[in-house]
């Protein structure tokens, strides 16, 4: 891996960490799950995205939707991405980035079979302030970075934060992503 690739990887890892720190809900319930899932669905309708969406507490689905032209495979991707969040307590994209940096897979590095875990972007932990991680939001059907971005956007909008300033592209514009986030949003 070249220096530029390493820098980009490190920048994305830092940006996702900031997203997970910032995108914490004051509470989470069935209505909020429905709002989050419906927001992502609305974007999918507007942009004709062939995605599947799920919002859940661990082991309790609260929202599921498969858009036109999505594949039955997307449901399996959702399951595997969600299992990654449940195991590592961080986004599936963050896990994938960290494994890539180490040069290992879930199987070679941790003994976890790829048929059960997907380390592609699109599943994000639902973290409740003063409670911790209680579930996940997952999207499947686009490029992994775009799946991740949809989930982040939904959480940002729900929290009343400017979605563009929580996006990976914004947070990785320079090596001061953390400082930039702290200055502009918090």
UniProtKB/Swiss-Prot annotation:
Record-linked PANTHER family: PTHR28255, UPF0303 PROTEIN YBR137W
Pfam family, one: HbpS-like
Species the sequence originates in: Zymomonas mobilis subsp. mobilis (strain ATCC 31821 / ZM4 / CP4)
Top-rank lineage group of the source organism: Bacteria
Official protein name in the record: UPF0303 protein ZMO1353
Protein family according to the UniProt entry: Belongs to the UPF0303 family.
């Amino acid at each position: 891996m070249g220096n530029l690739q390493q820098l980009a990887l490190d920048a994305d890892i830092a940006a996702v960490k900031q997203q997970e720190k910032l995108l914490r809900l004051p509470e989470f319930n069935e209505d909020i799950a429905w709002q989050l899932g419906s927001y992502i669905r609305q974007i999918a309708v507007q942009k004709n995205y062939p995605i599947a969406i799920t919002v859940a507490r661990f082991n309790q689905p609260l929202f599921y939707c498969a858009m036109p032209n999505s594949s039955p495979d997307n449901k399996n991707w959702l399951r595997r991405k969600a299992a990654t969040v449940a195991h590592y307590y961080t986004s599936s994209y963050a896990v994938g980035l960290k494994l890539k940096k180490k040069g290992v897979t879930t199987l070679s590095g941790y003994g976890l079979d790829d048929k059960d875990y997907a380390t592609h972007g699109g599943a994000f932990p639902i973290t409740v302030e003063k409670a911790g991680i209680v579930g996940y939001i997952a999207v499947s059907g686009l490029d992994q970075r775009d799946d991740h971005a949809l989930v982040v956007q939904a959480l940002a909008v729900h929290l009343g934060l400017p979605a563009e300033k929580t996006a990976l592209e914004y947070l990785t514009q320079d090596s001061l992503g953390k400082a930039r986030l702290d200055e502009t949003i918090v």
